[in-house]
From Swiss-Prot:
This is Protein phosphatase 2C 70. InterPro entries: FHA_dom, Kinase_assoc_Pase, PP2C, PP2C_BS, PPM-type-like_dom_sf, PPM-type_phosphatase-like_dom, SMAD_FHA_dom_sf. Residues 29-581 are cytoplasmic. The chain crosses the membrane at residues 8-28. Mn(2+) 1 binds at residues 346-347. Disruption phenotype: No visible phenotype under normal growth conditions, but mutant seedlings show increased sensitivity of roots to salt stress. It comes from Arabidopsis thaliana (Mouse-ear cress). Association of RLK5 with kapp domain is dependent on phosphorylation of RLK5 and can be abolished by dephosphorylation. Interacts with SERK1 and CDC48A. Component of the SERK1 signaling complex, composed of KAPP, CDC48A, GRF6 or GRF7, SERK1, SERK2, SERK3/BAK1 and BRI1. Interacts with CLV1. Its main location: membrane. It is a single-pass type I membrane protein. The gene is KAPP. GO terms for molecular function: [pyruvate kinase]-phosphatase activity; metal ion binding; protein serine/threonine phosphatase activity. Its EC number is 3.1.3.16.
Length: 581
């Protein structure tokens, strides 16, 4: 009985030891070491010797330095603008963020230095232990983990070139120079000679509005032009100027092709059309506008200019007056970049002679000043009398076809010396006049050539051909000096094309309140030079510091002539030498 009890106790002790051993075995899990050994053996079979010798990051500091200096040399351009937006955001949307630090000046890397930090939100299923992750080159990535054979440098040049090309592709792009100058000139119609220039970056002056009523940048006094006819905008996406018809009644053409809405007269806008240099815009049937486009500011005028004109129709008992005035200005003249021309012509017997003269005068003057000797003579002597006299003679010689048509001509020549001071000299035929305000007083730059004027009566008397009592016209013409009128000039020697030429005026840079007013007799018949100057001074004070004040002043003088009930065509050029306003 005792033996049976001892056997039971022994068996119980063995079971307890076995249970304790099992508990220890399960707690320690020794089988996991066998699993790791098998896995490690399998992984190690996929390694190559070259992979064990290849580091995760190149330890050649010169490589990274060379790449950085190359990018700087390619893209550090003076005056260049860069687009930086969007380079980082594209990486974030792909679930990857890359951060790159510039390498130190030392070719060796110190401990703790950070080169590339990579965070990957999408783990690779095929990645093996110790293997370098190769990420595909993606647009917008700022850095990439590299593999580099440091043992024999066999791939150094290839890797360098590939990385350089990749960095160049990923670097910020140079933004194209968006500056573009638009120049418009009316070459046909009642407002012939009117000009306007604008820069694509002058957002406050855009769009350019073409129409008959204010506020139009190109104010066209043509009954066929709608109040708001068309406008020109700068398309910053295409880098192009675009013209759109604003629902005009008589339509808009570009190079004889309509750009208006198909339902003409519906007041619906047309589609935008790209403009190119040398295009011709036709508004209605008579007004034509020449287009020039340049990437450089070749149209900049060193003073402010305002132009205004009105045929003053319905002033004579309800009879419509044809527009025979033409005005024109050009700065600089071709081949004479320090010279500019301002001209008003008033036709009689028709507008043909005036329109011919306004085209011939700038051409002849530019040809004369293209002679370097004559140009230098003007600059050195500060006097252009010979040039102006020659210009009128050559213009008159080219008007042979105008036997019964003539026109006045008032030409203001402005030039700049090497010290940036201006000079102004005027020549005229007829009764269109020019006045300049300088030094607190106004200066008459022209002479009145009407038959009844004192200067002409004196000239007749000196030639022994005095006027008879009560005689105020010759061959029905109230002018004694003009361009054209070839037949009357052949019949009466008192007619002349010899211009009056003023003394040159010097306008220093420091001069203030300097301006000129050129106008046809529609203004001067009802507004004296003194009153015109007073009106300008008042308007200058009111408009001081505002944009387009020159245009407003020109229109202000025109409104004064209208209020004074002028009965003749009126054209005005206002020239302000004080650009600080």
């Amino acid at each position: 009985m005792a033996m049976i009890g001892m056997n039971i106790i022994g068996l119980f002790m063995v079971l307890m030891l076995l249970l304790i051993s099992l508990i220890i075995l399960f707690a320690c899990k020794p089988w996991r070491y066998f699993s790791r050994f098998r896995s490690s053996s399998r992984f190690s079979s996929t390694f190559k010797v070259g992979d064990l010798q290849r580091p995760l990051i190149s330890d050649d500091g010169n490589l990274i330095q060379g790449q950085t200096s190359e990018v700087t040399r390619e893209y550090d351009l003076e005056g260049a603008c860069y687009q930086n937006d969007g380079l980082l955001h594209s990486s974030l949307t792909e679930g990857r963020f890359y951060k790159q630090r510039l390498p130190s000046s030392s070719p060796h890397f110190s401990q703790g230095e950070s080169f590339v930090l990579e965070v990957i939100s999408e783990p690779s299923d095929n990645a093996l232990v110790g293997q370098t992750l190769k990420l595909p080159a993606e647009k917008g990535s700022l850095a990439e983990v590299q593999t580099y054979d440091w043992q024999n440098n066999r791939n150094e040049n290839l890797q360098y070139n590939l990385e350089k090309d990749r960095l160049i592709n990923l670097s910020p792009r140079l933004v194209e120079d968006q500056r573009s100058w638009l120049f418009l000139e009316v070459i046909a119609g009642p407002a012939i000679g009117l000009q306007h220039a604008v820069n694509s970056t002058s957002s406050s002056k855009l769009p350019v509005k073409l129409g008959r009523v204010s506020p139009s940048d190109l104010a066209l006094k043509d009954s066929e032009v709608s109040g708001k006819h068309a406008q020109i905008t700068w398309n910053s996406t295409k880098f192009k100027w675009e013209l759109v018809d604003m629902g005009s009644l008589n339509g808009t053409l570009v190079n004889s092709h309509s750009i208006s809405h198909p339902d003409l007269g519906s007041r619906k806008w047309g589609n935008p059309v790209e403009l190119a240099s040398d295009d011709i815009i036709t508004l209605g049937t008579t007004t034509k506008v020449y287009v020039r486009i340049s990437s450089q500011n070749e149209f900049q005028i060193p003073f402010k200019i305002g132009v205004a004109s009105d045929p003053m129709a319905m002033r004579r008992g309800g009879r419509k007056l044809p527009m025979e005035d033409v005005c024109h200005y050009k700065w600089p003249l071709p081949g004479a970049n320090k010279f500019g021309l301002f001209c008003v012509c008033d036709g009689h017997g028709g507008s043909g002679a005036a329109q011919s003269a306004i085209k011939i005068i700038p051409e002849v003057l530019a040809n004369i000043l293209s002679d370097s000797l004559r140009k230098e003579k003007v600059l050195s002597k500060r006097d252009a009398s010979d040039v102006l006299r020659d210009m009128f003679a050559k213009t008159e010689a080219r008007l042979e076809e105008h036997q019964y048509e003539g026109c006045t001509a008032t030409v203001l020549l402005v030039w700049k010396d090497n010290e940036e001071n201006f000079f102004a000299q005027c020549a005229n035929l007829g009764d269109s006049a020019c006045v300049i305000h300088l030094g607190g007083r106004y200066i008459q730059m022209t002479e009145d050539h009407r038959v009844v004027s004192l200067s002409e009566r004196k000239r007749f008397q000196e030639a022994g051909l005095a006027l008879r009592d009560g005689e105020t016209r010759l061959f029905g013409i109230n002018l004694a000096r003009m361009l054209g009128d070839k037949f009357p000039k052949q019949q009466d020697s008192r007619f002349s094309a010899e211009p009056y030429i003023s003394e040159p005026l010097r306008i220093d840079q420091s001069s203030k309140d300097v301006f000129a007013v050129l106008a046809s007799d529609g203004l001067w018949d009802v507004v004296s030079p003194k009153k015109a100057v007073q009106l300008v001074l008042q308007m200058r004070d009111k408009e001081r510091g505002r944009e387009s004040s020159a245009e407003k002043i020109a229109n202000g003088l025109l409104n004064e002539a209208r209020a004074m009930r002028t009965k003749d065509n009126t054209s005005i050029i206002y020239l302000d030498f004080d650009t600080s306003l």
